[in-house]
Each structure stands twice: as structure tokens, then as C-alpha cells.
Amino acid sequence: HTAYRRQRQMCIRDSIISDAYVYAVENTGDSDGEKVDVAIVPAGTVRDTYTKGDITVEQVYNSFSLGTGKDGLAGYPLISAYLTGKELKTVAEVDASISDFMTIARLYCSGMNFIYNPHRMILNKVTDCYLTGKDGEREEIQDDKLYHVVTDLYTGRMLGSVLDKSYGLISIVPKDKNGNPIENLEDYAVMDGKKELKAWVAIAEYMQSFEDTDKDGIANVPEYYNTTHERKVIDSSKNIINLVKHPNKFAVAIVGICIVVVGVILLLIFGIVKIIRRRR
């Protein structure tokens, strides 16, 4: 129960953080008014949770003070980039398939929900993935469409490095709004005037925007964050149909490799048996 409670706390905390990214970018002085489709937060960059009670700016800073930006000041800046719909689905798959043994890849999103089955084949665990607007309405993801994504510098680099770590199996390439690959993510930091918009500042400003419901002069975390809103749902079904339906390209490739390996082994066994029989 303690582990479940802690996991739920983390989900709610990271939902607040990912929503803060969206709020900050859409409300910063340098915003061009373009809607943010998805915000991505990795659990690995968050150093502390937010417990019930007063949350100070110092606590927010301490929870997200890792790294620096181009300006050399403490804290990773927010990054504005674009991913294709296909890459967004891959982001969900990275979390579902890799995060259990590579915790920095555990991701939380605002604007994108997904369902995954931990018993399915690796890189084919996600069974449903879709966007959700501010009204909560479901929007299907179009594979070739560019979507506006906001994350922090650390996450942007981590997602970009997935290609190397997966030996080319997985590809997530942050792009500009015209679809050109971004070479230096630091050049795409979200600016607030002449300053980089730091992730911790975005979180603090978002919390300060909450309504003061008890009229004590301090903003209150909304009731909305008392639940996870099924942003990430685990379907633990072991039904054989649910385990094999809708195979993606990774599943097909893995099955193909297994068939080839088994075929080679059978040929070797057949060859060895043939040689032994000849010697007799």
C-alpha cells in the first residue's frame, strides 16, 4: 500500500509539473499564441515530491534545480520543439517498455494519454495512445502530423539520445516548426523576455496561479489533482488475444528476428545430425 501511495503521489506531482509546462509556455510574455499539444516530464529529473501542506518556492526550486541552460544559471530551461505523431507514440512506448530498467525514461505527459499492458512484448506494450485537449475530449494522433511539444532541456536531450541507445530501433528527433531536425536544443529554449524560462520557475508560477479557495492569501492546489485522470493506464490482462493483437513494427521485427534465429539453429542441428550419420 505504501508503494502504491507513493506511486500515486508521484503521478499527481508529475501531472502538476507537466501541466505547469503547458501553462508557462502559453502564458509567457514571448508566447506566439501557439497551442502546446503535449508536455513531457521525466521522473528522473524531479528530486523531491510535494507533500500535503504548504509548498514554498524554495521547495519547488529544490525539486527541480538540476542542470543549467545556455545562460549558465541553475535549472534546466523549457524547450519548445515538434515531434511527429508517430514519434509521440514512440515516447509512450519508451515509457511503457524501458522505464522499469532505465528509470530516467519514466515519463509523465500533459495532453497525451495512453494505455499499456506490461505483459506484452517489449516495444509493443502500448495498446492505445491519444491526445486530450483542455476539454478532455479524445483526439486521435496522426502519424505524419507535427505536434508542438514542450519539455525541459534534460528530457529533450534524453529523448534525442534514444536513437543511439536503441541501436537505431527507436527514433525520436526533436524538430523546429518546419519539420527540420534541431541540432542544438539550447537554441530552442523558451524565453521570457531576455531570460530563459526555467522549469522550476514555470512550476512555481503555475502553482501561484491556482485559486485561493480558503481565502488565507495562499493559492490552493485544485481538487482536479486528487486523481490521476487516467493519463497513464496499466492493463494487466493476460488474455492471449490482448497480448498479441495490433502488433507494431517493433513486434513484427522482433518476431522476424526470432524466426530467423530459430531457423538458423534448426539448420545447424540438421547439418550436425547429417554429418554424424555420414560418419557412421
Q: Where do the PLM segments sit?
A:
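Catalytic centers of hydrolytic enzymes
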Residues: 5-9, 13-280
